[in-house]
């Protein structure tokens, strides 16, 4: 029975076969970008490991420590990044290190991005916490885009730890 006069709203479009589409075949630029990063000469200021307390979400003073998880400081004071300093002390002199506390230096994202280029860290190590997670990940993104391997620690690095640990 053919119903040519039926309104399109009354026809069950889900009952017909949908042709399979081929997968998108985008060019892979990874090798070219990676080669360009490796070919670039390292500056005299380049470090092995950059330990970072990234810029804060709103430019205010925030606390990122294991026992004061990612909150604005009520006291309006800078909490020193003792954990980053301790790790730097353990890594030096075997590795060249740079500790950057953007919170203490009142450094914004633009200034921090400009700081990454001369130091060209091989590894970017930072503390993360749930309240500032998106902000903290942006720092990792900037470092990774410049060829650094990123390392994060903290109380709430991810809401999906099992998925994160998969290869």
What do the PLM-derived regions correspond to, one by one?
Residues 76-86:
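Conserved alpha-helical elements of sugar-nucleotide-dependent glycosyltransferases
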Residues 50-53, 88, 92:
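Short, amphipathic alpha-helical segments that act as regulatory/interfacial helices
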Residues 1-42:
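Non-catalytic N-terminal targeting/anchoring module and adjacent flexible stem/linker
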Residues 41-45, 117-120:
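Flexible, charged surface loops at secondary-structure boundaries
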Residues 83, 90-167:
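Glycine-rich beta-alpha loop elements in corrinoid/cobalamin-binding modules
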Residues 6-9, 16, 30-31, 45, ...:
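Residue-level marker of intrinsically disordered, low-complexity segments enriched
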Residues 58-63, 88, 114-115:
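Short, flexible segments with low predicted structural confidence
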Residues 26, 32, 39, 45-78:
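Short glycine-rich His-centered loop
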């Amino acid at each position: 029975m053919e119903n040519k006069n039926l309104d399109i709203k009354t026809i069950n479009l889900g009952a017909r076969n949908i042709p399979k589409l081929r997968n998108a075949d985008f060019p892979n630029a990874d090798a070219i970008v990676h080669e360009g990063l490796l070919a670039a000469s390292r500056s005299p200021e380049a470090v092995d490991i950059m330990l970072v307390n990234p810029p804060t979400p709103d430019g205010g003073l925030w606390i990122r420590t294991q026992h004061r998880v990612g909150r604005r400081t009520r006291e309006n004071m800078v909490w020193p990044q003792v954990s980053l300093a301790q790790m730097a002390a353990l890594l030096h002199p075997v590795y060249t290190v740079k500790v950057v506390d953007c919170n203490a230096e009142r450094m914004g994202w633009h200034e921090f991005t400009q700081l990454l280029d001369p130091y060209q860290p091989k590894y970017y190590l930072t503390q993360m916490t749930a309240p500032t997670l998106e902000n903290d990940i942006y720092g990792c993104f900037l470092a990774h885009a410049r060829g650094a391997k990123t390392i994060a620690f903290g109380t709430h690095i991810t809401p999906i730890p099992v998925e994160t640990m998969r290869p």
